[in-house]
Amino acid sequence: LLAGCAVGPDYERPDLAMPDTHRVEPGLELTTGELPKWKAVFRDPLLQALIERGLENNLDLAAARSRLREAEAELTRARAPLYPSLDVAAGGEREYESELTGGDGETADTYSFLGLLSWELDIWGFNRRRAEAAAADLESAQWSVYARQVSLIGAIAASYFNLVAVNEQLSLTNSTVATRIQALRIQELRNQSGMISGLEVAQAKVSLAEAEKQIPTLKNSRLVFENQLRRLLGEMPASVNTSRSFEDIPFATGLPAGLPSDLLERRPDVRVAELGLVAANAEVGVAKADLFPRLTLTGEFGTESADLSDLLDSGGRAWVATLGVAQPLF
């Protein structure tokens, strides 16, 4: 009965018009929330090793995982009031009753060993809605970690391919420079033998200079991509080993796909936005339930005795039950 009574709206996912079918590349299908099978797409062993290091050491991803652990703890805390709490207490006290207040002027000892039970009757769904919001926040944190992982994999791959491209361009430029140096020497020899004028020699020098001036720019670009890649890996700046050219890199022939509705569910930004709506919807229920009286059932049961040696005797049994009502006024 209590489980079915909770004020506030229940979340309902809006209907979306989606096609029934969509092209799927065999062997690369994904399930909802599963980390993409990136090794099936990025097959370069060097790139795979970099991605694994990034997934382990990236600082932004580590922060997202910390927020996930925080959300897990918050859900545990939010669910705790849904169940009775049971504690054990033992103690003793000595009291002197004044004759001026009707006492007998004697000292009295009392020893107790009690079990303490407390349970809030969640009639209006205050605690259930709060746990519902915490569960949505936890799932949102899980999808945020997933989003960081997917984004990190893509960023590492992009930086790696940029680095491969720059290295390939630098290698090609160095070859071009070497070729033009040879061409300049030939032109100089031809000029010395009177076969050509100095104009052709000057043109060869200009051509060589144009090739040589590209090298510092390419080296600077390589340094930028290396530092960018190291930052993604959570490491200090240093050189990065890559494949020599794109011809050495094996690529997959297709990309993961699926039903359009599944694709939406796998998009972290869409899932995080929806879960934010779920949490906000549950918080509406929390706010509404907080307007109603809150009932708490408490009880104490155990033994009490004036003599410590008699504390566990059956005649010392004692209990008390209390129903408390609290009504917010403002």
PLM segments and residue spans:
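Terminal intrinsically disordered/low-complexity segments used for targeting and assembly
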Residues: 2-56, 111, 135, 219-265, ...
